[in-house]
Amino acid sequence: GMRNPYRFSFDRGGTNQLWAGDVGQDAIEEVDTITLGGNYGWRVYEGTQCTGNDPGLCTPANYIMPIYQYPQTGSRCSVTGGNIYRGPQNTFPSGTYVYADYCTGEIFTNAANVTALLDTPRNISSFGEDESGELFITGLGGTLDKIVRARSSADFDGDFKTDVSVFRPSTG
């Protein structure tokens, strides 16, 4: 099973795969690709970590393990499932899964090691995309922000850590 799936999305421009963020209990936040009838291991596993609730069932081959996971360290506490980026503005490479931590406002991608790509000053409650595939984030306070590629080119190693920012449209 899953513990607490929070935000689902389909890869609408590629495989049509269903993705979900699954909020952990005490240790790990995870992102899963959803398979019909799939068993994602909750109560036996939190992420790829055996919980000890039923050690006799801790056999990874019996479960679908997460695609990405990160620990609940510091203020990280709740994954917000995101979207696969397919936009024409090349904010991210096409096919990149973009998601967040609700408590910290950090935005992550499907990089091999999960490190924050961008820190925002808000609790990200959801992602959305426009008709062209560009991504937006929302917060419970009513904010709607578009994620855009920064105008300067300071990302020398291609990891997107310095050339992505949040753009807030002006009101009026």
Report the location of each language-model feature.
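Structural WD40 beta-propeller signal
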Residues: 11-13, 85-87, 130-132, 157, ...
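Residue position within the beta-strands of beta-propeller blades
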Residues: 20-21, 99, 136-138, 166
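Conserved positions at the start
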Residues: 2-7, 79, 124, 132, ...
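Trp/Gly-enriched beta-strand/coil motifs that build multi-repeat beta-propeller-like domains
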Residues: 150-172
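Beta-propeller domain segments
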Residues: 1-112, 145-147
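Blade-level signature of beta-propeller repeat domains, shared across WD40, Kelch, NHL, RCC1
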Residues: 125-150
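Conserved blade-ending motifs and adjacent loop-strand segments that build the rim/top face
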Residues: 113-131
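Short loop/turn segments that connect beta-strands within the blades of beta-propeller domains
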Residues: 14, 103, 131-132, 140-141, ...
